[in-house]
Structure formats: structure tokens, C-alpha cells
């Protein structure tokens, strides 16, 4: 751990503290990036430093970087402290209600980012306009995740930025590296593609549309939001079909190295002599960097192609 750093409130404290378990989870969808770290505390230093919820913390080990995280809990135990932090400040996880008329997706993203002092980036996401949008007693992150899911997109929160990306755009990106699955590698995979949906019908009770990707049963979703047009319903049906099918085929690999150059939301070229059907591109849906043991655990899915 020669290049390892723990940056707390802008200061590298690693030379002054001992670190036990430390891992960061990055996710391309479904949850916010998180950090869990155990500090040895035989001299009771943490209590003197008065750690507080909302403090900023980050860990680094070469190219592997958690990005800025916000402390959610500090749990003292015998001779140690366990700190849990998330990539979004607590305010972004608090429930709120609001409505908009004639608003673009980019405006929703920018407003939420500004409210929490964060930046905002989009990749391949079309800036659709909505006639009416309502956020009803839900957190800003849950609200944005839902709206982006309708549009076949996802949300990553990393290092003080909201990153919205199109699923199709992500799958079209070149591989950032290669992973090999050879005999002896610790892996497991599951293929539920036979139970995937072939299409999706979306309705708000008044406006409906169906989008089909091929053979298979049809998913029916009744959404609480007002759908502005048949075209919008078709887009949402496609987006919800993506969300329902994107983990139908998945693999988990455990490695003896950190995989420092890999991140959730990237594409890798999988060479799988032990599971040849997986040869080719795969999407990193989640990755856990274990900074203490210098290992990684990678969750992969296969590109959907729509």
C-alpha cells in the first residue's frame, strides 16, 4: 500500500492512522457509489478529530480512486472506527416534492446538481422536453434515476459530479482493457436470457405504446407519470425494457489484482477460455476495489444492442 492515501477533509491522514478493511463499490446503475473503511484506533484519535456526517473522504491507490465521498456514518467499535460514505451528499438522498411544466431533461439534471453543489455531465443522452414532470416525495437521486431509466439511460455519481449516460452510447464505446477468464480464475455466471422480455408496453392509463426487441413475453408497466405523447411512450417502453433485461446474463469475477484502470460503466473485452460463450465485449455494471488486500471483484453484463 505504498501509494495508498486516505484524504479526509482535504488532508492525507494515512500516515497517522492504521487502516484495516477498505473497499469502494462503483456502480453503473441501481445504487450510489460507496466506501467502507475500518480504521484502527487504539489511541482514540478519531474521537479527538470529531468526525461528522457530511465530511469529505476519498481513498487513492495509483489509478484506483474512489473520488470524493461524503461520510454517512461513523461507528466506533473496540479499538477501531468504521466509516461508511457515499458519492452523493446527504441532501441528495432526502425526500422532496416539486413539479415542472415544459422542462427539458438537461434542466432537471442541472437543477439537481446545482442544488447539491455538484457538477453535471451527459453522454449520449437526448435532451427531451416534457410537458409535465412531478417529483413526489422522493430523493433527487431516485427521481433522476427513474427519469433516466425511462429514457434508456443511467446515472453515475462520481467525485462531485452527476454523470448521465445513454445505455446504447455506453455499449458502443471501445473497450478500456481486457479481462481473461481462464481455468483457475474465480468466477461465476448466470444466464437467464431465456426469461428475458421481448417487448414492453407502457401506459399511464390514457396514452400507451409498445416497443419490441424480438421474441419473448411482453412486460407491461403502468407508470404514475403523465405521458406526453405516443412517441414518448415508445421511448419509455424501450428504456424500461432495457432496465428489465440488462442483467439477464451476468458474470462475477474475483481477481488477485486491483484492476486500477477499470471503473463501473466501462466496457471491457472479455477473453473467456473457461466460458467461451462470454468472449467479446462486456459492460462493467459494478466493481469493488479492495484497497486493503489489493484485489477486485467485478460484475459484468452483456450488451443488449438496443
Language model: regions and residue ranges:
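Assembly/oligomerization scaffold segments
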Residues: 1-92, 184, 250
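Acidic, small/polar-enriched beta strand-loop surface segments
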Residues: 1-8, 48, 157-159, 166-294
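A structural detector for beta-sheet-dominated domains
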Residues: 7-9, 25, 38-40, 60-62, ...
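Amphipathic, non-transmembrane alpha-helical segments in extracytoplasmic/periplasmic proteins
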Residues: 37, 97-120, 135-159, 202, ...
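Extended Gly/Ser/Thr-rich low-complexity repeat segments
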Residues: 46-59, 93-103, 179, 263-271
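Short beta-strand and beta-hairpin "edge-sheet" elements
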Residues: 60-85, 269-294, 299
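Short beta-strand-centered interaction patches in the first periplasmic/extracellular domains
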Residues: 80, 87-88, 122-193
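Glycine- and charge-enriched low-complexity intrinsically disordered segments
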Residues: 98-102, 300-306
Amino acid at each position: 500500500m505504498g501509494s495508498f492515501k486516505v484524504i479526509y477533509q482535504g488532508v492525507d491522514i494515512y500516515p497517522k492512522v492504521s487502516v484495516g478493511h477498505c473497499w469502494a463499490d462503483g456502480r453503473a446503475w441501481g445504487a450510489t457509489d460507496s466506501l467502507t473503511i475500518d480504521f484502527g484506533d487504539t489511541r482514540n484519535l478519531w474521537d479527538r478529530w470529531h468526525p461528522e456526517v457530511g465530511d469529505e473522504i476519498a481513498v487513492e491507490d495509483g489509478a484506483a480512486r474512489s473520488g470524493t465521498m461524503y461520510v454517512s456514518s461513523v461507528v466506533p467499535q473496540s479499538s477501531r472506527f468504521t466509516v461508511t460514505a457515499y458519492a452523493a451528499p446527504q441532501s441528495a438522498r432526502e425526500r422532496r416534492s416539486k413539479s415542472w411544466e415544459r422542462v427539458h431533461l438537461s434542466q432537471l439534471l442541472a437543477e439537481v446538481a446545482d442544488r447539491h453543489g455538484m457538477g453535471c455531465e451527459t453522454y449520449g443522452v437526448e435532451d427531451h422536453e416534457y410537458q409535465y414532470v412531478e417529483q413526489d416525495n422522493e430523493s433527487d437521486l431516485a427521481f433522476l434515476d427513474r427519469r433516466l431509466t425511462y429514457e434508456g439511460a443511467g446515472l453515475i455519481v462520481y467525485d462531485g459530479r452527476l454523470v448521465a449516460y445513454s445505455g446504447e452510447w455506453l455499449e458502443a464505446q471501445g473497450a478500456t482493457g481486457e479481462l481473461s477468464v481462464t481455468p483457475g480464475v474465480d468466477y461465476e455466471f448466470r444466464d437467464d436470457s431465456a426469461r428475458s422480455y421481448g417487448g414492453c408496453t407502457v401506459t399511464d392509463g390514457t396514452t400507451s405504446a409498445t416497443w419490441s426487441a424480438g421474441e419473448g413475453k411482453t412486460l407491461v408497466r403502468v407508470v404514475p407519470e403523465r405521458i406526453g405523447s405516443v412517441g414518448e411512450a415508445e421511448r419509455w417502453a424501450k428504456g424500461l425494457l432495457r432496465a428489465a433485461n440488462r442483467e439477464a446474463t451476468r458474470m462475477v469475477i474475483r481477481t488477485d489484482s486491483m484492476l486500477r484502470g477499470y471503473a463501473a460503466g466501462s466496457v471491457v473485452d472479455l477473453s473467456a477460455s473457461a466460458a467461451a460463450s462470454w468472449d467479446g465485449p462486456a459492460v462493467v455494471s459494478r466493481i469493488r476495489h479492495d484497497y486493503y488486500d489489493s484485489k477486485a471483484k467485478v460484475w459484468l453484463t452483456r450488451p443488449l444492442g438496443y
